[in-house]
């Protein structure tokens, strides 16, 4: 019996070390995403929710490991996870739009400070010994299930856009591997709170990998540069004066019989444009810059989005 117990302990320690290494890979798998965020100085529609929830989960598991004896391997990996997730969130807050920063800050205050503080206070004051371990264990199980379910929004996004841009394969692969290793660790340690949530983690990880294989060769429904905006349900809004210019252009083109209007100006197709004969109007969020380039005998008009007819002048509206 003593030999079997020692062998079980050895295997548990081995799987614990493997779990630490693989979980570290899981924590580091979003690095390409955040390198891209750093390089482009934009979060490009990526959400912070999975990272906030993961940080909260690491904090709770560290607390659980401190309360439960013989769980040092849980302390090490979750401590490292807290540091890594904090770095990710700091980068997100640095480059996200104001609305996303505010939402992330509210989640951090409410979840990682508020709720964690309440849980710590209640378990310290109202429970002791094994009861405290069990209360914390079930809380950790519930939060871990939330962490594994957090990518559901990404799965929905992949199905809608038919693009795997927002779901790295490496993350899904390491989630499956991590779930298997930690399940075996919990089984050998007879810790149901560690083993149970990793069953669902394995299922979600396999689902993500299957989705990646299904959509990796499909053409996205939206262009890569605009997929984030489409995914977020955003719509490009033009200034009112640009809309008025577009309306005038449409009316002028529609009213011109056989390519001419009464004032003598001609309506030319976009293909007939001469680049050297342009008056360009670039529309900015705050100001309008005009660049005039006049050359040649005729006065032609080139319009990128719409054509505007005006005597003796050609106008380009670039939106």
Swiss-Prot record:
Residues 13-99, 135-219 form the MtN3/slv domain. It comes from Oryza sativa subsp. indica (Rice). One of its GO terms (cellular component) is plasma membrane. Mediates both low-affinity uptake and efflux of sugar across the plasma membrane. Keywords: Cell membrane, Membrane, Repeat, Sugar transport, Transmembrane, Transmembrane helix, Transport. Residues 32-50, 94-106, 156-167, 213-319 are cytoplasmic. One of its GO terms (molecular function) is sugar transmembrane transporter activity. The gene is SWEET15. Forms homooligomers and/or heterooligomers. Gene3D superfamilies: 1.20.1280.290. Residues 1-10, 72, 128-134, 189-191 are extracellular. It is a multi-pass membrane protein. The chain crosses the membrane at residues 11-31, 51-71, 73-93, 107-127, 135-155, 168-188, 192-212. This is Bidirectional sugar transporter SWEET15. It is found in: Cell membrane. It comes from the Eukaryota. InterPro entries: SWEET, SWEET_rpt. Belongs to the SWEET sugar transporter family. PANTHER family: BIDIRECTIONAL SUGAR TRANSPORTER SWEET15, RAG1-ACTIVATING PROTEIN 1.
């Amino acid at each position: 019996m003593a030999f079997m117990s020692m062998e079980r302990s050895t295997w548990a320690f081995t799987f614990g070390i493997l779990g630490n290494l693989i979980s570290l890979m899981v924590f580091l798998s979003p690095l390409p995403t955040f390198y891209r965020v750093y390089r482009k100085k934009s979060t490009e529609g990526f959400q912070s929710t999975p990272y906030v929830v993961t940080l909260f989960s690491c904090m709770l598991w560290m607390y659980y490991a401190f309360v439960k004896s013989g769980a040092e391997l849980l302390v090490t990996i979750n401590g490292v996870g807290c540091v890594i997730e904090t770095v990710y969130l700091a980068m997100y807050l640095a480059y996200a739009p104001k609305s996303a920063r505010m939402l992330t800050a509210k989640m951090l205050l409410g979840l990682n400070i508020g709720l964690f503080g309440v849980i710590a206070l209640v378990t310290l004051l109202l429970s002791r010994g094994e009861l405290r371990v069990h209360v914390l264990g079930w809380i950790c199980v519930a939060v871990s299930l939330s962490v594994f379910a957090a990518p559901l929004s990404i799965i929905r996004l992949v199905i809608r856009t038919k693009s795997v841009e927002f779901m790295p394969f490496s993350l899904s692969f390491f989630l499956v591997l991590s779930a298997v290793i930690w399940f075996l660790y919990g089984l050998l340690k007879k810790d149901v709170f560690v083993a149970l949530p990793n069953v669902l983690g394995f299922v979600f990880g396999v689902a993500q990998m299957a989705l990646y294989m299904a959509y990796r060769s499909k053409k996205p429904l939206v262009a890569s540069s605009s997929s984030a905006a489409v995914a977020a349900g955003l719509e490009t809004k033009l200034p009112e004066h640009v809309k008025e210019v577009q309306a005038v252009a449409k009316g002028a083109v529609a009213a011109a019989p056989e390519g001419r209007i009464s004032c003598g100006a001609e309506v030319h197709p976009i293909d007939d444009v001469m680049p050297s004969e342009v008056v360009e109007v670039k529309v900015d969020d705050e100001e309008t810059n005009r660049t005039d380039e006049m050359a040649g005998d005729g006065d032609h008009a080139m319009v990128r989005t719409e054509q505007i007819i005006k005597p003796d002048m050609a106008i380009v509206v670039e939106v």
